[in-house]
Design a protein with these regions (language model features):
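C-terminal output helix
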Residues: 113-123
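Alpha4 helix (beta4-alpha4-beta5 surface) of REC/receiver domains from two-component response regulators
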Residues: 72, 92-109
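Acidic, metal-coordinating helix/loop segments flanking the phosphotransfer/catalytic sites
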Residues: 40-58
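Acidic catalytic/metal-coordinating carboxylates
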Residues: 43, 69-72
Length: 127
């Protein structure tokens, strides 16, 4: 007799690369309970190490980080893990949008953004 038990839907993994504690907390609050598993790291070095072991569906990437700029890290992610979708977030430099998109970011959100903008962006990339 076939097994008809339903396995729970596996949550999609989202990696947040953000060094500011308040912003990281806000992102966690905004996305909590949205059927996704959230992980976060505070710099690009930690992100590289994380990606060696885990491949999230989506990366939320801040631009200004302690050990470099997110816009420069986009092409590294895309070359090594082309299936990963990237949402670049930045509040410092609107001109980073063009560079981020040219380097392979799927979406650019300028801070401040709304909960709906963030959630709809992630949802759209996961479908």
């Amino acid at each position: 007799m076939p097994d008809t038990t339903m396995e729970p839907t596996k949550a999609k993994k989202v990696l947040i690369i953000e060094d500011e504690g308040d912003m990281c907390l806000l992102l966690n609050i905004l996305l909590n309970g949205k059927e996704m598993e959230l992980d976060h790291v505070k710099n690009l070095s930690a992100a590289k190490e994380y990606l060696l072991n885990e491949q999230p569906s989506v990366v939320i990437l801040d631009n200004k980080l302690p050990d470099g700029f997110g816009v420069d890290f986009i092409s590294i992610i895309k070359n090594a893990y082309p299936a990963i979708k990237i949402i670049m977030i930045s509040g410092y430099d609107g001109s980073a949008k063009d560079v981020a998109l040219e380097n392979g970011a799927d979406i650019f959100l300028e801070k401040p953004f709304t909960r709906d903008q963030l959630y709809q962006s992630i949802k759209g990339l996961m479908n």
